[in-house]
Amino acid sequence: MNYPPMGLTHDDPGKFVLGTVPVEPDGSAHFRVPAGVTFFVQALDEQGIAVQTMRSATYVQPGQTMTCIGCHEPRNTAPPARPPLAVMRAASPIELGPAGSWPLHFDALVGPVLEQHCVRCHQPDADASQLVFTPERAYDILVDYGQPSLRTHVLDRYRQGRSAAGAGAAQTNPLAILLRQGHHGVQLDADAWSRLYTWMDTYGQRRGSFSEQQDEQLRQLRDELAAMLAAQTNASDGADECTMMPVTAYETRRRGE
C-alpha cells in the first residue's frame, strides 16, 4: 500500500475522477456509470467545490438499476409522495473531469496551473523566491501550505473516518481561500479552478495508480467508455443506471476508485 507514494494517509487505494452530473431542484440525480467500477460520490456547490463526500463505495453490475433512497432521509418521515424529477427524464451524461484526473496525477492535473499562474514569481530569482515551485518541490509545498494545511485536513478526516458537511478540503484550504480573496492579481479561469478543487477534494493525491501499466489500463478504460459517459443513450451492455436523492441539490461528482 502507498508504494509508490500515492497520497497523504499512506493508506490510499488509488482513485480517479469519472466526472460530474447535474442534480435537479429536488435533489435527485439520474445517470449511467460503467459496470464493475467501484465509485463514490461527492456533492458539489455551484463553484464545483465538494460540500460533502460519501464515505463508502459501491458498484453495479451490467444492466443493473440502483436507487439510493433510504439512507439520506430522516427516520421518522415518509418518502415524498411524488417521483423524483430526475427519473422523469433520460439519464444525464457524465461530463469528464479536467485533464490529469483520469488517470489522476498531480503533475498533470495541477502542474499546468502552476506553470501558467505561479512559477513566474515563485522561482529562485523572483520576488516570491521563499516558495519555489519546481516539479520536485511543488507537491510538498502545496500540501503543507497554511494552517490547517491540506495535509492536516486530510489526516484529521482520515482519523475521524467521516466527512463533515461544509468542511471539505477545497472549502477550508488556506491556499484556495487566498486565491478566492485575491493574490497579486492572479486570475484563474474555470479550468484552473476545476483542476485545483478536484485535486484538493480528492484529498491531495500525488497519483491515483500504482504503475505505468495501470495508468495505461485506465486510459484504455476511459477511451472505451467515452461514448457512454458523454452521450445520452439507452442502457446497453457494460453500463448501468443510478438514481440518487442526495441531501443537497448541488452537482454530484462521480469519483472512480
Outline where the language-model segments fall.
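Short, acidic Ser/Thr/Gly-rich low-complexity loop/linker segments typical of extracellular
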Residues: 9-26
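Extended low-complexity, serine/threonine- and proline-enriched intrinsically disordered segments
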Residues: 1-10
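Short, surface-exposed beta-strand/beta-hairpin micro-motifs centered on an aromatic residue
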Residues: 26-32
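Aromatic- and Gly/Pro-enriched helix-to-coil junctions and flexible linker segments
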Residues: 13, 36-38, 42-57, 62-257
